[in-house]
Amino acid sequence: MDDRILTSVNLEEDSAEYNLRPQKLNEYIGQSKVKEKMDIFIRAAKKRGEALDHVLFYGPPGLGKTTLANIIAKEMGGNLKVTSGPAIERAGDLAAILTGLSEYDVLFIDEIHRLNRSVEEILYPAMEDYALDIIIGKGAAAKSIRLDLPKFTLIGATTRVGLLTAPLRDRFGVLCPMEFYNDEELKEIIVRSSSILDIDIDEDAALEIAMRSRGTPRIANRLLKRVRDYADVKGRGIVNLDSAKKALNLLEVDDEGFDSIDNKIIQAIVNNFAGGPVGIETLSYFVGEEIDTIEDVYEPYLLQKGFIMRTPRGRMATKKAYEHLKVPFNMKKNGTVNNDQCSFFKKEK
């Protein structure tokens, strides 16, 4: 289990605070482009009396994919069924889930890129024709029977859209990239959560927590609860700027929202490899983290903040990374990598 305070992976305590999640689209903070699209598509589907087309949310973890799926189910008047790619081991497991759905239900599959191929193929007729093809018998006596399914909506979520097979990706009618939240959006989320949790917090403290939350609501809510703990013991239960800073410093969350592992990645590239480029396998060895963990959990935020960039030859540190470590940046020695070049991240899959 990942016990980092800054991990965007869902922890047990995050699930326990279900009441922090908005229940309506107009209560959902951030992701304005996604909200606008989904509002139109939901209203159009309801107007025609149809199920909403299948939706794919993709982006780093902790940005609200599951919350949006729950809101969509409520807006469509159906129930939400939640599962994940690794949990569906056999085609029969998925068939049982599909046959248990009702009209306008939403089936949410997290980590959908991890579905195995035999299971994935069951989804094709289910998504296209609302039908389930079942093989009965074996050998020459085997025959295929098609069962009709209720009109449902499949919502897939993935942190690695590039790993989806083309046949599966092409069957989604709505594709929505999820973006990191800005500080003001996170501040609004923190103020809302504080009201629900009955936390006495001022705006400066809320903004301080927001700025260290890695653009991720899940992390913002987790940090809020840890700052509350500190304030209850050290600050008479009042979360102000001073108590927020002291609590976050105690948690070793710096002004950029980095923890020790983020800094290890930057330090490895700068100090051990002269700024790069360095391959992901080598970087993984030096940092002591799995490749998938670096790519899914750490890199997206470091890229978005402009501290590293990905090139065909490997990862490179930017001038901003050198400034963060207070290491001199030599243009001739370290190449021409600058913060503007990190727009490359937006073009990457």
UniProtKB/Swiss-Prot annotation:
GO CC list: cytoplasm; Holliday junction resolvase complex
- Its recorded name reads Holliday junction branch migration complex subunit RuvB
> Which of UniProt's keywords are assigned here?
ATP-binding, Cytoplasm, DNA damage, DNA recombination, DNA repair, DNA-binding, Hydrolase, Nucleotide-binding
Q: Which reaction does it catalyse?
A: ATP + H2O = ADP + phosphate + H(+)
Q: Which Pfam families match?
A: AAA_lid_4, RuvB_C, RuvB_N
Enumerate the InterPro entries for this protein.
AAA+_ATPase, AAA_lid_4, DNA_helicase_Holl-junc_RuvB, P-loop_NTPase, RuvB-like_N, RuvB_C, WH-like_DNA-bd_sf, WH_DNA-bd_sf
Q: Might you give the EC number(s) for this enzyme? A: 3.6.4.-
Give one GO biological process term: DNA repair
